[in-house]
Amino acid sequence: MTTPSKFRDIEIRAPRGTTLTAKSWLTEAPLRMLMNNLDPEVAENPRELVVYGGIGRAARNWECYDRIVETLKQLNDDETLLVQSGKPVGVFKTHANAPRVLIANSNLVPHWATWEHFNELDAKGLAMYGQMTAGSWIYIGSQGIVQGTYETFVEAGRQHYDGNLKGRWVLTAGLGGMGGAQPLAATLAGACSLNIECQQSRIDFRLRSRYVDEQAKDLDDALARIQRYTAEGKAISIALLGNAAEILPELVRRGVRPDMVTDQTSAHDPLNGYLPAGWSWEEYRDRAQTDPAAVVKAAKQSMAVHVRAMLAFQQQGVPTFDYGNNIRQMAKEEGVANAFDFPGFVPAYIRPLFCRGIGPFRWAALSGDPQDIYKTDAKVKQLIPDDAHLHRWLDMARERISFQGLPARICWVGLGLRAKLGLAFNEMVRSGELSAPIVIGRDHLDSGSVASPNRETEAMQDGSDAVSDWPLLNALLNTASGATWVSLHHGGGVGMGFSQHSGMVIVCDGSDEAAERIARVLTNDPGTGVMRHADAGYQVAIDCAKEQGLNLPMITAQR
């Protein structure tokens, strides 16, 4: 028996156009989106199957990838493929309205849900870290997080700077698949940004894709640029090669005062995602193989230094927030007792949106034709004519966001509007206005699909932060509603032991049957978010549930 391979020197791109390589669009869609996750324009390290987020993979190994592709090409429209941590393990007869693929990634019994145990399983070829959209085949590059980051910066600007970020700057770190959205999001929100990254290859990736505007040669140069651009009122993003655990304390020592501080390094995974201060990347990767315990310790010690600097900025009155990478938890475990003194971004800025089921609705054009996305942009504006903020986002996205892989769009909308848009897109496919079917999905970071006490469900007003029934119910309901593929993951965003979350994707192929599935899925999916927040006592969610006619027996029947 040959050893499974996690490396292959190959370039993968999803097919374009209308010629099927599978038996129907319901199986062609997951096939193309799996391949799109590994497109070199999309993935961070596609030759090792890594899509984003440390070691977030699309398949467990290359042999599993090959078999998934072969199986999808042969799958019938009354069969369902089961994928267990990136490995295709079974095909079963179901029915036409069942999902074509069901995916479970990285799930561990809670007592064993640690990085140490997961890494043992991973080394034996028994598990795969799916992050959120890596192992669920609906990653669309950094655009997938741009609008959420933009909405966060805009809301922070409203709360702290009267809604005007002109002449202000954001300090952050991490330019990977998620963090790479920060510089563009800050620019779109009207602010300058200084973005620290320890790998030159990632800076090059963001410069190429126009997510970051320019690179400074050193810290002094970066600060000079920040001073010049903020004085001129320009929103320019600057990348700086370096280590945040070294640069942030130096900025504190110098008395430099940003206008906002956050972080999107891959701190959730100390073994693979956070470079210890004073180490080279090569040393880090080598020692991860030979002495993983020492690497984890060194990384977490550096995170503690990093968080202490963030706390120092907060104590100066600078708005400072965690952007969901669990760095506060890591620092607390290294003795920073007050690591949670600064809030996470969801309770600080995003939760009111979640209460109305508003979250990261996204779609991709299976044709590969950008015009299909531009036509859907226009349709969104037509169907939501009075939302100037949304229109501005779509205009900025078209102007500034480069497509990575298959053309795609992210657009935060909520209960009611998601189904309305999905049905309209399906009709555009039916009429031939779009040249091929569209897939609609979302991040697992959504209002009803995640339990993550250090991120999406931090500081719930009823104390239900760690209750993970909700993402399980979300996955079950999306399966019953007829989503094309459904995923249930553990550990995304914040690492092993700290989150459970689910995802769904639905195909708009222009058929009447698709319209029925779309209406169910795109109503029920955001509906679970409103339900979850209404159950926690949020009045905004309770009001939304009543307005939208949700049947919540313990709430809408009584209040």
Swiss-Prot record:
HAMAP family: HutU (MF_00577). It catalyses: 4-imidazolone-5-propanoate = trans-urocanate + H2O. This is Urocanate hydratase. It comes from Pseudomonas aeruginosa (strain LESB58). The active site is at 411. Keywords: Cytoplasm, Histidine metabolism, Lyase, NAD. Its main location: cytoplasm. The gene is hutU. It is an enzyme of class 4 (lyase). The lineage of its organism: Bacteria, Pseudomonadati, Pseudomonadota, Gammaproteobacteria, Pseudomonadales. The keyword DNA-binding does not apply. Pathway: Amino-acid degradation; L-histidine degradation into L-glutamate; N-formimidoyl-L-glutamate from L-histidine: step 2/3. SUPFAM superfamilies: Urocanase.
